[in-house]
Amino acid sequence: MTELQQIIEAAFERRDSITPGSVDAATKAAILQAIDLLDSGKARVAEKIAGEWVVHQWLKKAVLLYFRINDNGIIKGDDAQYYDKVPLKFSDYSAEQFKAAGVRVVPPATARKGSFIAPNTVLMPSYVNIGAFVDEGTMVDTWATVGSCAQIGKNVHLSGGVGIGGVLEPLQANPTIIEDNCFIGARSEVVEGVIVEEGSVISMGVFIGQSTRIYDRETGEIHYGRVPAGSVVVSGSLPSKCGKYSLYAAVIVKKVDAKTRAKVGINALLRSIDE
């Protein structure tokens, strides 16, 4: 455990006594350092190590402590004023800083301090919360929301109105993760620490939480909390045990590899789900 982590862990144990006026200098400096590490992408709440996702809970604790040490303050916008504890990521950026970051931010897209936006990323009018990590080549489309501490991989497309859940409380919960090369269709919601594995395609209007049954029609297997790599998923339903009604489910209609996905294209994959 690093010294920074030790300070954060100790501060979190006494979090109820920490206020903007009472926080000691060493604790405040540690919290700000942790937020800067998240903001720069040098640290992230979750990362894949040896093929498994590892969650760094102490960084989530640092985010929660950040709220404890900040007073609300005015945040200026072009046409309005806002009042919050967390400043905006790009509020003081110059044209040179935007060029160096390699990101496009379309008004009125909002990213909070403590989120990381990698190069070659496009933020249409959307929202990225504190602690989130958005990797290279990703498109966050109009009115999409990337929740606190969510992890978005490389070359992901979050379509219009998509919601990726944030998980700061309960603290033991894992962040929602969208792995590399995934497509999330318009108005879909992925929440509660669900992992959408690499190369998956989620159709429009699919809702997936930890309790959602994810049914593979080819094998009959039911998954919870995880969409297997290369899955093409649509909204559907499964019959109840008594056969009197059906309940919502996400249905894996096919599996595709990277070569097929690149050759065929997203629309063709979704149009041919009855094949």
From Swiss-Prot:
Predominant place of localization: cytoplasm
UniProt GO BP: diaminopimelate biosynthetic process; lysine biosynthetic process via diaminopimelate
UniProt entry keywords in alphabetical sequence: Acyltransferase, Amino-acid biosynthesis, Cytoplasm, Diaminopimelate biosynthesis, Lysine biosynthesis, Repeat, Transferase
GO cellular component labels: cytoplasm
GO MF assignments: 2,3,4,5-tetrahydropyridine-2,6-dicarboxylate N-succinyltransferase activity; nucleotidyltransferase activity
Broadest EC class assigned to this enzyme: transferase
UniProt xrefs under Gene3D superfamilies: Hexapeptide repeat proteins, Tetrahydrodipicolinate-N-succinyltransferase, N-terminal domain
Alphabetized SUPFAM superfamilies for the sequence: Trimeric LpxA-like enzymes
Subunit note: Homotrimer.
Protein name: 2,3,4,5-tetrahydropyridine-2,6-dicarboxylate N-succinyltransferase
Organism taxonomic ancestry: Bacteria, Pseudomonadati, Pseudomonadota, Gammaproteobacteria, Aeromonadales
